[in-house]
Design a protein with these regions (language model features):
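Extreme N-terminal starter segment of soluble prokaryotic enzymes
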Residues: 1-4
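Generic structural signal for residues in well-ordered beta-strands
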Residues: 26-27, 102
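Structural alpha-helical scaffold elements that stabilize or flank donor/cofactor-binding regions
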Residues: 35-36, 65
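An anion/phosphate-binding loop that grips the pyrophosphate of nucleotide cofactors and donors
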Residues: 39
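Cysteine-nucleophile active-site neighborhood
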Residues: 48-123, 232
Length: 239
């Protein structure tokens, strides 16, 4: 299997490369349109600023390339945000794969510090609270011990037997498992496209899915065995 990782001006790429290597696959880090189109799977990762990232993608024609991909594609962190229609960060028009508008967190409590940085549970029961007790804001720092369970559920999308269901991304992940977040902006909930949600000052999309496009706000490559399972699930999704 050929896994391509989109090469652009975003950080945190090498942790994704190493995570894929741990699964026994040597990924291709590339900005070549033909190589991306021919890959069996494409990962669109990164941390960065939306307007700078979109400017880079447009200058190299990668915006059109990504939108035209037919194989399973996984956006991570800013990759998820750039898949949306627009971002408040830099008042940026994005790829428009998903219709949502990316918003900045506006915390109302002193203890809610932006960016959200740490371990948080993803919630899929629709009960509106993915947080658990940790460092005072419902999360655990990267160097803290992470509890084994909280709440995990799917939001919006219906669980079914289809091999291309968004639920496939979470197969084998235990209810309430924790994942790692670092972000100041969020994708709002959407009844059709949100497949997992989290809570930090409000409920938002922790993962979204449309056709062959999957995306997570959290970092599976930094989320231990849970994140590894999610990456395994993505690589196993039928084309």
């Amino acid at each position: 299997m050929q896994v391509a990782i989109v090469k652009y001006n975003a950080g945190n790429v090498f942790s994704v490369i190493n995570a894929v290597k741990r699964l026994g696959i040597e990924p291709l880090w590339t900005d070549d349109a033909e190589a991306l189109a021919k890959a069996d799977r494409v990962i669109f990762p990164g941390q960065g600023e939306a307007s700078h990232a979109m400017s880079y993608l447009r200058q190299r024609g990668l915006d059109r390339v990504i939108c035209d991909l037919k194989q399973p594609v996984l956006g991570i962190c800013i990759g998820q945000q750039l898949m949306c229609k627009h971002s408040e960060e830099g008042d940026t028009d994005c790829l428009g794969i998903f219709p949502m508008e990316v918003k900045r967190f506006q915390p109302t409590r002193h203890e809610d510090k932006v960016p959200q940085m740490g371990w948080n549970s993803i919630n899929v029961n629709g009960n509106g609270n993915g947080n658990v007790n940790g460092n005072g804001n419902g999360m655990f720092n990267e160097n803290e011990d992470v509890p084994s369970s909280a709440r995990l559920s799917t939001y919006g999308a219906q669980e079914n037997e289809d091999s291309n269901s968004g639920i496939d991304l979470f197969k084998g992940v235990k209810e309430g498992d924790f994942v790692y977040f670092v972000h100041s902006y969020y994708v709002p909930l959407h009844e059709e496209y949100t497949i997992a949600m989290a809570n930090f000052t409000l409920d938002y999309s922790a993962a979204i899915h449309k056709d062959n496009f999957y995306a997570t706000q959290f970092h599976p490559e930094k989320s231990g065995m849970v994140g590894q399972k999610i990456l395994e699930n993505f690589l196993a999704i039928d084309n």
